Amino acid sequence: MKSNISINTNSHFPYLGNGIEFTENLFGLEFNAELIQKTSGLIWQPNSTLPYSTLKRLPAPYNILTDIALEMTVHNKGKKGLIGHNSLLNEVKSIDGSLMDKFILEVQNHIDNPTRESAELIANVRCWSSWLANGIKIEPIFNGQKKACAFIPWPLSGLLLLSSRITGQQPEFEYAADYVLRSGVLPDEELDNCDDLNKNVDYIRSIKPLVAFHDFDGNEQGFRMTHLAMERTSNMMIENALLCLNNDDIKENLEKIELATKQSNQLFNAMWKVSEPLLYN
């Protein structure tokens, strides 16, 4: 629960820890807006929409989250996954409640001494938990029912809520952060340009999703990884926009923004080659 909320807009646009202040009390822990902003800054690259690192398998004892999530995909590399068998919810119910106690201690250590390593662990717990929670939600739909599941069992619900609050994210499934930005592995090599549609398609197909609901190499992979490929242009857009605001070589920087926007659109147009357009009607 938030308390001591204040917003100050004097002389600058407010953000967490600098104009937007509050205290968060949750599961016996206390942290503030400044700590949330610092945690976020340890996870996400500056002047970009990309994280410092992609999602990683969790270490013990949190590896149970990774293990279940990697088995949930409906079309799971030649076999039917947990969602396809309508058994994901039951698997998640088997997670021991003591995992939440361990995570609370982990977060307390981060509050006392926030590091990139501790922030990354929290971010990874959040991402895997979010995938599992949303997998539970949509599991009935995949199995012919008309209503989604509205129940997230403990301790998954607690892990998701605490990890979301301290990273400044919503507990609800985040399209950008969860579905795309942190759950795909970009190749080391970047495209020199995006003028060749076939090369764009090959590049998108080379991006490997780490977790999925429906498939790892079909329509879902194509849709998600197209958007991840597009995000590689974000740094050029943001940095040159900031330079324009500082009246620094405006013409040159506007041309770079135009190029980044063009490349983003060229990659987006490849999506219809890697996923079925009728799915989006």
Language-model region placement:
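Internal amphipathic alpha-helices that form coiled-coils
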Residues: A241-N269
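Feature marking long nucleic-acid-engaging regions of large polymerase/nuclease enzymes
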Residues: S163, D178, L191, F213, ...
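Intrinsically disordered, low-complexity acidic/proline-rich regions
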Residues: M1-N124
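Non-transmembrane, amphipathic alpha-helical segments
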Residues: E117, G144, G218, G222-A229, ...
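Short, charged/polar, low-complexity loop and linker segments
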Residues: S206-R224, E239-N247
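Extended amphipathic alpha-helical segments with heptad-repeat/coiled-coil character used for oligomerization
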Residues: I5, F13, E258-N281
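Long, charged all-alpha helical bundle/coiled-coil segments in cytosolic proteins
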Residues: I104-I207
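Hydrophobic faces of stable alpha-helices that mediate helix-helix packing
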Residues: H227, E231-A241
